[in-house]
């Protein structure tokens, strides 16, 4: 097996969901001088359920996470022998291209998420049985309920499921998303009932305390404006850094929520795509309205992901 070094508001309910789901178009505007100054972060507070809907208790267990550095840290991804090497909105035109080599890493580790058989969201593997997505992909703040009927297929290509399909054994998101619909903590983690990542591989991820402005990045996922199960992506750069969000002009569409935002040179995930551009952003801690936005991997999220990926699905 080969290994790649990958660095592991309270608002109205309707506005939160609308911002997360709608797709619009306009010309991106330049960032202002102070766009990267607000790097204050909000701490994570996990809440979860098992496959029967029973609440799960949270208690950190991973010593690897507890000992992570204060300046920045990373965790390696994994390329399986089975994989070969290799809401979002359209900002101006559509720069996305279709990616058909879904059995090649890292595309193989990007997860097509369906709900009741229909295109729903995107995720990305972080271990053999663990994936990351957006919080609104697993919990509806508007309806105040965990979403059911979800299935997860890494490396999907149209109707093809080269690494099979799994269901959720555990589902996690943030208390701030559940109670407030906070866009600053719109993250989700799913423990699967199968070890799909053993064949698909998984991403590494990273965090740093400073800004990511002008970092070259990739954004790939399964949008619902294309044929079901088609993987589309675009290259670009991070335009603005916030404490809990990263902002960019790479084109996306609904159902690309949960997509990995990863650095181009090493395939290291730094954020989780969650929102399209537009109104409904009320604080300086959110991305400027002309940009698409992703939940930033902070130190807290980094440590949480390490912890959750090390847990047994039956815990």
Task: Identify the function of each model-found stretch.
Residues 1-33:
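Secretory targeting and sorting signals
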Residues 29, 299-315:
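PDZ/PDZ-like groove recognition
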Residues 29-125, 314-315:
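Protease-domain processing segments flanking chymotrypsin-fold serine proteases, especially trypsin-like
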Residues 86-108, 115-119, 139, 144-197:
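Conserved catalytic-core segment of clan PA serine endopeptidases
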Residues 129, 133:
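Cytochrome P450 catalytic-core helices
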Residues 134-137, 254, 271-279:
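Short beta->alpha transition motifs characteristic of CBS
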Residues 158, 168, 183-256, 284, ...:
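Chymotrypsin/trypsin-fold serine protease catalytic domain
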Residues 251-273:
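Catalytic nucleophile loop of clan PA
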């Amino acid at each position: 097996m080969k290994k790649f070094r990958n660095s592991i508001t309270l608002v109205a309910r309707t506005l939160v969901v609308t911002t997360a789901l709608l797709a619009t178009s306009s010309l991106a505007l330049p960032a202002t001088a102070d766009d990267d100054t607000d790097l204050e972060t909000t701490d994570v507070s996990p809440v979860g359920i098992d496959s029967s809907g029973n609440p799960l208790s949270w208690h950190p267990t991973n010593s690897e996470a507890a000992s992570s550095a204060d300046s920045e840290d990373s965790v390696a991804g994994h390329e399986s022998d089975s994989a070969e090497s290799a809401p979002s909105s359209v900002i101006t035109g559509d720069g996305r291209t279709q990616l058909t080599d879904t059995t090649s890493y890292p595309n193989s580790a990007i997860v097509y998420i369906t709900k009741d058989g229909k295109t729903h969201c995107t995720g990305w593997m972080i271990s053999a049985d663990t994936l990351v997505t957006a919080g609104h992909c697993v919990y509806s703040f508007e309806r105040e309920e965990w979403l059911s009927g979800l299935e997860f297929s890494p490396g999907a290509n149209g109707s093809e499921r080269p690494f099979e399909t799994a269901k959720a054994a555990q589902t996690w998101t943030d208390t701030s998303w559940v109670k407030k619909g906070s866009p600053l903590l719109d993250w989700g983690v799913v423990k699967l009932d199968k070890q799909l990542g053993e064949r698909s591989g998984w991403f590494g991820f990273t965090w740093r305390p400073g800004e990511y402005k002008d970092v070259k990045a990739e954004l790939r996922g399964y949008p619902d404006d294309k044929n079901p199960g088609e993987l589309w992506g675009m290259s670009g750069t991070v335009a603005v850094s916030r404490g809990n969000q990263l902002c960019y002009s790479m084109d996306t569409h609904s159902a690309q929520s949960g997509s990995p935002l990863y650095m181009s040179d090493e395939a290291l995930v730094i954020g989780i795509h969650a929102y399209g551009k537009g109104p409904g952003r009320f604080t300086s801690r959110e991305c400027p309205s002309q940009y698409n936005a992703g939940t930033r991997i902070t130190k807290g999220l980094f440590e949480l992901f390490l912890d959750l990926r090390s847990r047994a699905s039956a815990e």
